[in-house]
Amino acid sequence: MRILGLDLGKKTIGVAVSDPLGFTAQGITTIRRANKEKDMEELRKICDEYKVETIVIGLPKNMNGTIGPSGEIAMEMGKLVEEALNIKVEFWDERLTTVAAHKAMLEADLSRSKRKKIVDKVASTYILQGYLDRISK
């Protein structure tokens, strides 16, 4: 059982996948967004390669817990992904995942250009790992 984690951005989609047992998340790629059809094609390839059964999408929430415009866009994308790929989609609160990703990369002493290239992939790993930790309890 593999689970895919997605961090949706305007220009890129960070992608992480669980190990086969669903204990750990590993960042695997960052998809450069083009259009809905090409984005779905890229996701389909990844889902087929890893035999994904569930997709977890980071849901941006305001600090007070409400869902704003970015959250609504993520929910629309989730519906599109579920229909296009016929794979169950769940959402995970992604508040502060990008902040945590930046902090971890700074502590690892990565250059600014390197951080910029992988921040979405790292954030998707945080999203997926949070979800995996919850379902394993």
UniProtKB/Swiss-Prot annotation:
Xref: SUPFAM superfamilies: Ribonuclease H-like
Any GO CC annotation of this UniProt entry: cytosol
The keyword Transmembrane helix is assigned to this record: no
Protein's UniProt name: Putative pre-16S rRNA nuclease
Main location: cytoplasm
Function per UniProt: Could be a nuclease involved in processing of the 5'-end of pre-16S rRNA.
Superkingdom of the organism of origin: Bacteria
Enzyme Commission numbers on file: 3.1.-.-
GO molecular function terms attached to this record: nuclease activity
Family: Belongs to the YqgF nuclease family.
Localization: Cytoplasm
Annotated GO biological process: rRNA 5'-end processing
NCBIfam families in the record: RNAse_H_YqgF (TIGR00250)
Record InterPro entries: RNaseH-like_sf, YqgF, YqgF/RNaseH-like_dom, YqgF/RNaseH-like_dom_sf
Sorted UniProt keywords: Cytoplasm, Hydrolase, Nuclease, Ribosome biogenesis
HAMAP family in the record: Nuclease_YqgF (MF_00651)
